[in-house]
Regions:
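Ankyrin repeat domain, specifically the short helix-to-loop turn at the C-terminus of the second helix
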Residues: 25-31, 60-68, 94-101, 127-134, ...
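A generic tandem-repeat structural signature
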Residues: 66-118
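Conserved ankyrin/ankyrin-like repeat signature
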Residues: 20, 57-58, 90-91, 124, ...
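Intrinsically disordered, low-complexity regulatory segments in ankyrin-centric signaling systems
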Residues: 1-28, 33, 37, 41-44, ...
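Ankyrin-repeat boundary/"N-cap" motif
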Residues: 3-9, 35-46, 72-78, 105-113, ...
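Solenoidal tandem-repeat scaffolds enriched in leucines and small polar residues
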Residues: 102, 110-124, 131-132, 140-144, ...
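Ankyrin-repeat-protein effector appendages
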Residues: 2-8, 108, 199, 240, ...
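Ankyrin repeat A-helix N-terminal signature
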Residues: 11-16, 49-55, 82-88, 115-121, ...
Length: 276
């Protein structure tokens, strides 16, 4: 069977033609495992593709035929996340409420704790902790701890739940960008920054990932590199003792980064606090 033949399942899925999908699977049951050849579609499986397109009927059929429910290759995310990010609520509900037990490696909850925390699904986060207290240390596929994404996305209640359960406030993301939860929050999440600082996050911690473009950055420098121009975070960090003279691995201060990027709001705060 050639590549063109294996790819026929994808347009059938996208159009919602269940008869065609069923016929193709009867001819070759292994089609549930093929990958899309177009890199712009992230080499998705048919189930990831169906979830992203909101085709609930196709999702059901593919799962019935043995599709892997919690597919998580190194260049993409599981079907439930494709559905969530494309705002297909009924498909998300199917994965999380009807077949969560089919999602391997998720404590029978349908999604890993890291991604539940990323989405703000606090009840699922709580259930993970109840079923596996060590899940607060689980790593996502980019090396993130469960604290990284809720810190980035300003989900303060989830941050508190994780910290109360023993999550490491100084955990480094180890596979992609680097940085601790405070670095991630410092991009644009003032409420998360406030909670992390109140809970003891080191305000002058460093991004330790040597091959990251953010290597050596403190949370303040990280804040000064982001297009959000979030001066509220700048104030919080400085008031907590952030070193405005600190430089990153390239020898640049927060002020230097703001000038390069035209971040006038952050620059104004830095200058008001004596940056030069």
């Amino acid at each position: 069977m050639g590549i063109a033949t294996t790819q026929a399942i994808f347009p059938a899925v996208e159009s919602g033609d269940l008869d065609a999908v069923r016929r193709l699977l009867e001819e070759d049951p292994g089609l549930v495992y093929v990958r899309h050849t177009d890199p712009d579609v992230h080499h998705w499986t048919p189930l990831q593709f169906a979830a992203a397109k909101g085709q609930l009927g196709a999702c059901r059929l593919l799962v019935e035929r043995g599709a892997e429910v919690y597919t998580n290759p190194m260049n993409s995310y599981a079907p439930v996340m494709q559905a969530a990010w494309n705002k297909h609520a009924e498909v998300v509900k199917y994965f999380l409420e009807e077949i969560p037990d089919k999602a391997a490696g998720t404590n029978g909850l349908g999604v890993a704790i890291n991604l539940a925390a990323r989405q703000g699904w606090i009840e699922i986060v709580r259930k993970h902790i109840d079923r596996d207290p060590l899940s607060v240390h689980q790593r996502g596929w980019i090396g993130d701890s469960p604290l990284h994404w809720p810190s980035h996305n300003n989900y303060t209640e989830i941050i508190s739940v994780l910290l109360d359960a023993g999550a490491d406030i100084e955990a480094d993301e180890i596979n992609c960008y680097g940085g601790k939860p405070l670095h991630w929050a410092s991009e644009h999440a003032p409420a998360a920054v406030r909670v992390l600082l109140d809970r003891g996050a080191a305000v002058n911690s460093r991004n330790l990932k040597a091959d990251s473009e953010f290597c050596g950055m403190t949370p303040l420098i990280m804040n000064a590199t982001q297009k959000n121009d979030c001066a509220e975070v700048t104030e919080l960090l400085i008031n907590a003792g952030a070193d405005i003279t600190a430089v990153d691995a390239k020898g640049k201060t927060a002020l230097a980064h703001t000038r390069e990027r035209g971040l006038t709001r952050i620059q104004e705060v830095l200058l008001a606090h004596g940056a030069a």
